[in-house]
């Protein structure tokens, strides 16, 4: 019987990546970020280990959606009390908390387990172009989510 080699935990050193969300499609951006957080881009990916990297997303306020999703996509939350349902459109949530839009999209693409919650903590999202993680020397990760666009 063949067994898949499991990398030792001390060899799993995470890297830091910087992703610019300006003029990127929300869903396609979230797919790439989720893959980086899980570590699926690495040759030593192991599903039950945290092999992922840290991802810094800047310019969250400039992420776009296509079609009528700007006014028709709804975000719901509930306070737990009777009648406590709050509903916001994409445009309202992006104006109020632009980071939350990307966080919710990426969180839905990660495993809904303890490991997924741990990987989600490696996501850092900022509304503007500045972030406090210069000391980690993040590498710019080029991302192109517009199909057919010339790069």
Swiss-Prot record:
Keywords: Ribonucleoprotein, Ribosomal protein. It comes from the Bacteria. It holds the Pfam family Ribosomal_L13. One of its GO terms (biological process) is translation. One of its GO terms (cellular component) is cytosolic large ribosomal subunit. Disulfide bonds: none annotated. GO terms for molecular function: mRNA binding; structural constituent of ribosome. Belongs to the universal ribosomal protein uL13 family. Part of the 50S ribosomal subunit. This protein is one of the early assembly proteins of the 50S ribosomal subunit, although it is not seen to bind rRNA by itself. It is important during the early stages of 50S assembly. This is Large ribosomal subunit protein uL13. It comes from Synechococcus sp. (strain JA-3-3Ab). The gene is rplM.
């Amino acid at each position: 019987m063949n067994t898949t080699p499991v990398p030792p935990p001390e060899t799993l050193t995470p890297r830091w990546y910087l992703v610019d969300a300006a003029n990127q499609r929300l869903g396609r951006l979230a797919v790439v970020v989720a893959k980086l957080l899980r570590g699926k881009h690495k040759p030593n990916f192991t599903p039950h280990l945290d092999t992922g990297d840290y991802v810094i997303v800047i310019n969250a306020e400039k992420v776009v959606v296509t079609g009528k999703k700007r006014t028709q996509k709804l975000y719901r939350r509930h306070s737990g009390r009777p009648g406590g349902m709050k509903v916001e459109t994409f445009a309202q949530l992006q104006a109020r908390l632009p980071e939350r839009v990307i966080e919710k999209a990426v969180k839905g693409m990660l495993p809904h387990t303890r490991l997924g919650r741990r990987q989600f903590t490696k996501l850092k999202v900022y509304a503007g172009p500045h972030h406090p993680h210069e000391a980690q020397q993040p590498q710019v990760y080029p991302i192109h989510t517009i199909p057919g666009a010339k790069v």
